[in-house]
């Protein structure tokens, strides 16, 4: 019985703390998420076939050939 009361009080305190901090942080988000069109345009930014793909941060539209370090398109079926 004593343990149950302690657990109930702990849950109530944690819930109250979350509600208080949620109210305080309303409207103070610094970095808002990107719009879906921006996400799509960034996700489709890749290097074309024939481009060097050694130590770049961008990825190939197809795949990077290991020995030639060139981007190659996927074969069409």
UniProtKB/Swiss-Prot annotation:
Sorted UniProt keywords: Calcium channel impairing toxin, Disulfide bond, Ion channel impairing toxin, Knottin, Neurotoxin, Presynaptic neurotoxin, Secreted, Signal, Toxin, Voltage-gated calcium channel impairing toxin
Name of this protein: Omega-conotoxin-like SO-5
Pro-peptide positions on chain: 23-42
Tissue distribution: Expressed by the venom duct.
Protein's job: Omega-conotoxins act at presynaptic membranes, they bind and block voltage-gated calcium channels (Cav).
Signal peptide positions (record): 1-22
Keyword NAD: no
Gene that specifies this protein: SO5
Top-level taxonomic group: Eukaryota
Family to which the UniProt record says this protein belongs: Belongs to the conotoxin O1 superfamily.
């Amino acid at each position: 019985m004593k343990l149950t009361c302690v657990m109930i009080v702990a849950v109530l305190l944690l819930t109250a703390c979350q509600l208080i901090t949620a109210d305080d942080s309303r409207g103070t988000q610094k970095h808002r998420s990107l719009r879906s069109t921006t996400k799509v345009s960034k996700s489709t930014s890749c290097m074309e076939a024939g481009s060097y793909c050694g130590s770049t941060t961008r990825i190939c539209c197809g795949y990077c050939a290991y020995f030639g370090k060139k981007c190659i398109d996927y074969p069409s079926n």
